[in-house]
Amino acid sequence: MAADKPADQGAEKHEGAGQSSGVTDQEKELSTSAFQAFTSGNYDACLQHLACLQDINKDDYKIILNTAVAEFFKNNQTTTDNLRQTLNQLKNQVHSAVEEMDGLDDVENSMLYYNQAVILYHLRQHTEAIAVGEKLYQFIEPFEEKFAQAVCFLLVDLYILTHQAEKALHLLAVLEKMISQGSGNKNGKSETGNNSSKDGSNPKAESAALIEAAKSKIHQYKVRGYIQMKSLKACKREIKSVMNTAGNSAPSLFLKSNFEYLRGNYRKAVKLLNSSNIAEHPGFMKTGECLRCMFWNNLGCIHFAMSKHNLGIFYFKKALQENDNVCAQLSAGNTDPGKKFSGRPMCTLLANKRYELLYNCGIQLLHVGRPLAAFECLVEAVQVYHANPRLWLRLAECCIAANKGTSEQETKGLPTKKGIVQSIVGQGYHRKIVLASQSIQNTVYNDGQSSAIPVASVEFAAICLRNALLLLPEEQQDPKQENGSKSSSQLGGNAESSESSETCSSKSHDGDKLIPAPPSSPLRKQELENLKCSILACSAYVALALGDNLMALNHADQLLQQPKLSGSLKFLGHLYAAEALISLDRISDAITHLNPENVTDVSLGISSNEQDQGSDKGENEAMESSGKRAPQCYPSSVNSARTVMLFNLGSAYCLRSEYDKARKCLHQAASMIHPKEVPPEAILLAVYLELQNGNTQLALQMIKRNQLLPAVKAHSDVRKKTVFQPVHPIQPIQMPAFTTVQRK
């Protein structure tokens, strides 16, 4: 007998009294009666027969196992804690560890291990469940066909959930061969030692139906595997088979919608989701899946890809509401706080998707410009997915965005003199203009509490980035730019998870080692390099904001040493290194970093999936133009990046009292951009230079007009102390635009 797993409705159930050798006729009769009573749903009669068997053979642990499973089904599969406890006791009686499974005895004990793997699956202990399942797979030859298929389907499901699509597809090929042969391993022993367990069934009609159901399930698993691998051509072939075998059922329509989503056909994906009949779904109490929750989540992911972030947030909130309603109904049935897995069907242990939805919602809020709300979502998700370096980076980005100036100040500069002039004091001859400080103080959540407390502060951002770096594997090569914080959902029939929608296409190297990053998709080698570059850039920025110049210089140097660095991050690396060096009074080294010739490219390095996705489309199909575009980031061109370099280079020359060089850099930069695009810091630099030159009136005119004016050639022998004050650095978080405010 086996605890039936909802994803594998064909899992076999057996009753037995012991080994087939030495079994009396009375034991065989009781065993057969118990099995027939179990399959017909008469669990009371089944338990009575098992009790009689127990009286005859008190030392056979398999009778205890079957009794526990019968009790479990009698209670509508709601006593998971009791079944789990019994299985653990029996496992300790048979073997102390799974690693000891290496002999023929383990074939006889296979049903015990299978039941244990099923429970581990429902408790989301996927690694442990895979370890047990793979041990069972080693002894699959003697198993009878139905049980062998159940083991394979369980392993396939686990491989899909852990993003091991290649292993899943290999196992599906084995399953297809097993089903096509038809005979299976009929001459093997049944899992519980009763060879007469199938006597009461009528083979042909039932067998044909089971084979068709298994084939349909295989096609669905193949689609899910190909979707994970982004192998859209192979997926397209399997989608046709799914629609032929499963029709317009909700799982098949969800899978096809996911396929169209990956191809960029977002409107078609939405149309397919809307055409699914959710009302026909059996419900989460029977399957463990809340289809409404999955529906809203998938709509949110599609609208995220279409850059309709506010709509995406709306749909994710609807999904969270559905999920909370499901959890409230499930928690109402549990009256014993000591047994947290009991009081509800075992399949519903997989129903709660709160943390996956919070992850998606947090990423969406971060893109829409609500970092504090995003932080609240992600800080809750990280308590469960604490081993995901990408999630720690997102938390750091929330902290950075929450502690920087407004987007208007950063992207447009200060449009009027009101932004430059803080106040005017005195009257008449004593009238003075007080210029505003351009430093941005970190005042959010800065109340003296420990930086380890999860609040959206720059100090906590430093901790998040440190965690992210520690979670990255050491050996990495071929970095590319980090490809964003996209989220999507696995729209398969059995589970959903958040995924990065900018993951590698099917043309990525098969040899890449995958690094798990739940709930998003695992990280391939090039994605790890992209991620490391983004983490280093953020780390340098945060270190500068905290005044840790040595650490900032270290991170910036590491960033610039990456073998394949995107142009935009290389630009930031030079700026951050220069600022740290200036703070360390190493002006000459800083000037080397501020050379405009260092900037030859400002691309993000994002390789869009659209080319790969479009290659399998028919001649009459067109790719949608919306969604998955690279965001407009600052600087938008090499020219504007070099302008920033020149402004900052002029500031560095000021620190060495080389005012002529500073003035030359300033006017060269101003000539490269529109006058309205000149940042206020550049105007303040020009004011300072004119004051140094003795042109007080021209400096006042610049302040009044808030623009650069032609310099008057007058020289002053008086050299005043420089009043250089660095501006809060720009930061590399992916927002609608980078700030034009640069350090000088």
Curated annotation (Swiss-Prot):
Its main location: cytoplasm. The modification N-acetylalanine is found at residue 2. GO terms for cellular component: CCR4-NOT complex; cytoplasm; nucleus. Residues 183-200, 602-612 have a biased composition (Polar residues). GO terms for biological process: mRNA catabolic process; negative regulation of translation; regulatory ncRNA-mediated gene silencing. Component of the CCR4-NOT complex; distinct complexes seem to exist that differ in the participation of probably mutually exclusive catalytic subunits. CNOT10 and CNOT11 form a subcomplex docked to the CNOT1 scaffold. This is CCR4-NOT transcription complex subunit 10. The lineage of its organism: Eukaryota, Metazoa, Chordata, Craniata, Vertebrata.
